[in-house]
Amino acid sequence: MAVPKKRTSMSKKRIRKNLWKKKTYFSIVQSYSLAKSRSFSGVSEHPKPKGFSRQQTNNRVLG
């Protein structure tokens, strides 16, 4: 015999909704920090061009 389910209380709904929101928030924060680190990691892969400052350090006079 089919029995209707009891209705879920508003507080339980709110708790479950907030848990879902927390999970999504933390996944967003994690993905944002990963994207930030990836965008700045490319800086170290490409060395700076050797310019005036590089030549100046090599031509020091020791005395």
Curated annotation (Swiss-Prot):
It is found in: Plastid, Chloroplast. Residues 38-63 are annotated as: Disordered. InterPro entries: Ribosomal_bL32, Ribosomal_bL32_plant/cyanobact, Ribosomal_zn-bd. Pfam families: Ribosomal_L32p. Residues 53-63 have a biased composition (Polar residues). The keyword Metal-binding does not apply. One of its GO terms (molecular function) is structural constituent of ribosome. One of its GO terms (biological process) is translation. It comes from the Eukaryota. Its main location: plastid. One of its GO terms (cellular component) is plastid. The keyword Chloroplast applies. Keywords: Chloroplast, Plastid, Ribonucleoprotein, Ribosomal protein. PANTHER family: 50S RIBOSOMAL PROTEIN L32, CHLOROPLASTIC, LARGE RIBOSOMAL SUBUNIT PROTEIN BL32C. Belongs to the bacterial ribosomal protein bL32 family. This is Large ribosomal subunit protein bL32c.
